[in-house]
Amino acid sequence: MESAPVKRKAXGTKLLLGRQEHHRNLVEGSIVRIKMENFLTYDQCEVFPGPYLNMIVGANGTGKSSIVCAICLGLAGKTAFIGRADKVGFYVKRGCQKGFVELELYKTSGNVIIKREIQVANNQSVWYINHKSATLKTVEEQVPALNIQVGNLCPIPATRTKFGEFANLSKIETSKKQLKNHVGTPRNVQVPLRIEELHGEKKELAGACKSKAEFLEKLNQRNERYKQDVERYYQQKRHQDKIDMLERKRPWVEYENVRQQYEDVKKSCGNFKDELKKLQGLQAPLNQKIQQIEKRQRIIDEKIKDKAIEIKETSKNCKQKQDELEQKDKQIEEVQQSLRVKRDAEQERQKKIGNIRKMIEDWEKELSAMTNQENIQPEMDSINTDFRRIQDDKANIESEMTDLRMEKDNLEREKKEKANRIKQFDNLMNLKEEKLKRMYSDTYNAVVWLKENKDRFKNRVCQPMMLEINMKDQRHAKYVENHIPMNDMKAFVFESQEDMQVFLKEVRDKQNLRVNTVCAPQEPYAEQRPKRPITDLKQYGFFSYLRELFDAPYPVMNYLCYQYKVHEVPVGTEQTRSMIEKVIKETDLRQMYTAEEKYVTKKSVYSQKLISSNVSLKGAQFLTVTVDAEERQQVVDQLKEIERKCSTIETSMEQLAERQRSLDRRDNELRLRKKTILEMKTKKRQLEQKISTKYDSLNRLEQDNLNLEEVQQQANNRIKNLNVQKAKLVKDLLELMKECTSLSIEKVELALQSTAISSEKNKIESDYKSATSQLRELKNQYDGIEAKKLHLLENCKGLLRKARQACNLGPNQAVPQDFQTAFQSLPESLDEIDAMLNEERSRASCFTGLTASVVDDYNKRTKEIQEVTEELNRKKLELEDYRKNISQVKEKWLNPLKQLIEKINDQFSSFFSSMQCVGEVDLHTEKEEEYDKYGIRIRVKFRSSTQLHELTPHHQSGGERSVSTMLYLMALQELNRCPFRVVDEINQGMDPVNERRVFEMVVKTACKENTSQYFFITPKLLQNLTYAEKMTVLFVYNGPFMLEPTKWNLKAFHRRRRRVAAVDQ
């Protein structure tokens, strides 16, 4: 057995794994050499595997699977098969722009070297074969030519994930994915494509035959059903022909009936015309007599009209005289009325004179009764002086009140601004608390309890750090959140252990809330300065230490400086990131931040060299909302001071208001006294003015004296003259009235004559009207008959046209003989024709939904039935041929397949027997004819007390499935020859007993002569395993500084082993 250590990369070192020999025992296509550069964990590494079993052992994360990835990708494998990353660029070592994988494959005519160079920038690969540029297609053709199948789970299960996928395959999937692709040849193992095609075509043909037969049956049934419709259609047509003939005859019968009526009416019309002429001859004399009477009547009416004109003229003159008399009466009344008005005016004048004298007398008495007013003016002057002094005091008070009011308004505005600012602070804090409530409800409930019970603690207690920390710039919140773990971000900070125990007893023990607490140190770590000023680090892009980016209460800041050294962790920019290697070497910083990453450096315990790691920063979640507690407290203090000032101003304003009310009362008293004095002076002046005015009015009334006797005499003379004029008018009126009476008598006599003539005229007109009425009635009867005659004539013409149209005849065309013959067999009256029409229509209506297309469809369907019958017979012959072909192909396919599965079963059973277990493999199907559902069934039994059970993802344990799957793959591998096989950590999950048995089988199988090259990758090994001389063991260590195997002290190893054995005993 050969062993060679495999060490992880160091920068700049080249690793050689294995021995560069063994070419004589290699199978064509085996791997001679694997070279990797900037690939996954390796800077540069070259592996030389042995021809038989190559066991690669190393701790997790050392790079074992990187060798498997190199084999898959170097042989044109897809990244999806590896299941590690979807883009090939991700397989290049971090920080490098390109890398490559190179594989040398053994070939008798000359080894083949395949190189894949991977570019990170464009995620592309460049291929080389024997150091010459090639295409992916050329590589994909070259690899299968060496019998290498990269995507085949049989030679390369590759990873535990792919191995688990294989273990979870169903019977049918196992058959298709393994036997079809990985064992035997297509001719004697896989379900031949031809039998699947024949079976599919046979199914399609059988389905087509079945559908055609069903379709033919439906056609026959439908045609049989429509046969009755055809017969009914012909019955309907016979009824319809009779209806058409009745509809043709009916207009001719209507025409004949109307023509007969026309002849009868034409005869009656001649009789009425003769009688009308006779009555017109008798009416002429009466008309002449009426005209003579009307002439006499007109003469008398003219005379009556003349008398009426004369009477009207006379009456008009009488009316005129009566109007003149009425006018004279009005004039007399006006004179009398004027006399009465003057008498009343004189009486009123005398009354007013008496009243005015009485008023003057009373006012003079009141004026003489008023006291002397000489002492009023000094009192008035004193009142004015006091009034001016009060006004000055009130103005001063108002000025002071205005100043205080303005000052108070300013303070109110400031008070409102401060209150709004506090509200803004509270809103921001509420946002932080709401976020805390959503994500950590227990911590939030503890915060609520703390606010209500702060008096229970002796020292200061700070809320969770995420609430207490306030960023100076929200953009820097991500640095603080990435630096402080979330458990501390949501932790309460105490200054004493005693307070913390009180809090935990209440919150954790009683309320069962899950909260974190920390106790700030007593030493003043928050006051410590960084070892190096930030100015010294600005050349590297650093702009601040972490502590300077936020504010927090002293206990919180003290704890953060103590626990997380926030005062010594600098924050940089993209400039820092671009020169990070220089920063790490020159600054000796243990932690630092760039724009988007956090870097941590430490010294290796082996080499004392600096080792750095970096992580990308997560986005801030809690500290994006900033609340400055000190500023809020300042605003609260300012608000209290403003409220105190407002209270002082209100007290001063109340005092001034009381003084102002006292001055107002004194002012009202002075105003009332001044008003009283002024009213006394005003009243005296008014009395004097009134007396003077009334004396003037009295003088004017005494001067307006009137002589009533003279006025009476003038009125009497005026009335006397008017009475003389009235007497003359009455005399003229009487003469006119006599003349009007004479004319009225003459008019009455003429009216009597006119009445007698009218009576005679009415008698003659009555006789004339009677004759005229009789003549009119006869004329109306004649006109009605004449109109009826014309109507019947037009009706006859219309009916004749209609009858000809019904028979499709021209204006001068005679009725065809066949129509006349058909008409003779039909009824002659309209009632009989209508009755027969209704009967035939009723019968025809029983055949609804029938058209000529029914007959056409019936004929077409009959023809289609013949065609479908011929096609069905033809397909049945084809189906029989397919059955014969499938039977022949089945015999050629199924027997070799059963033989192959028997061989697999022999190998599988042998492997299980060597483990004192039972295993079987057989060909299984539910239905013999469903060839695409043939599957390989694997049944296993691990305990003697159980039965054989099919291998499924649910029945066996994970270790039992791994063992079964591995042995099944080994059974397949005995039948499938390939250059090399790879298994990666398949022993994970196996119990020690099965793992040992499987390992021994792998060693035994892989180390036989003429076997394929084998790569067995594992992170662990059991003790006291059986190894073979032909094995090659490759150890992969976690660094380049491990002791070389040539320098191992084997004697010391043996001594330690003996001591361990002695302790175990």
Swiss-Prot record:
Keywords from the UniProt entry: ATP-binding, Cell cycle, Cell division, Chromosome, Coiled coil, DNA damage, DNA recombination, DNA repair, Mitosis, Nucleotide-binding, Nucleus, Telomere
Location of region: Flexible hinge: 438-628
Binding-site positions, ATP: 58-65
Gene Ontology cellular component list: chromosome, telomeric region; nucleus; PML body; Smc5-Smc6 complex
One GO BP: double-strand break repair via homologous recombination
Pfam families assigned to the protein according to its UniProt record, in alphabetical order: AAA_23 (PF13476)
Coiled-coil ranges (or none): 210-439, 629-797, 855-893
Primary residence: nucleus
Keyword Coiled coil: yes
Molecular function GO labels: ATP binding; ATP hydrolysis activity; single-stranded DNA binding
Compartment(s) where it occurs, according to its Swiss-Prot or TrEMBL record: Nucleus; Chromosome; Chromosome, Telomere
Binding partners and assembly: Forms a heterodimer with smc6. Component of the SMC5-SMC6 complex which consists at least of smc5, smc6, nsmce2, nsmce1 and nsmce4a.
Function, as annotated: Core component of the SMC5-SMC6 complex, a complex involved in repair of DNA double-strand breaks by homologous recombination. The complex may promote sister chromatid homologous recombination by recruiting the SMC1-SMC3 cohesin complex to double-strand breaks. The complex is required for telomere maintenance via recombination and mediates sumoylation of shelterin complex (telosome) components. Required for sister chromatid cohesion during prometaphase and mitotic progression; the function seems to be independent of SMC6.
Stated family: Belongs to the SMC family. SMC5 subfamily.
Record remark on domains: The flexible hinge domain, which separates the large intramolecular coiled coil regions, allows the heterotypic interaction with the corresponding domain of SMC6, forming a V-shaped heterodimer.
Protein name (record): Structural maintenance of chromosomes protein 5
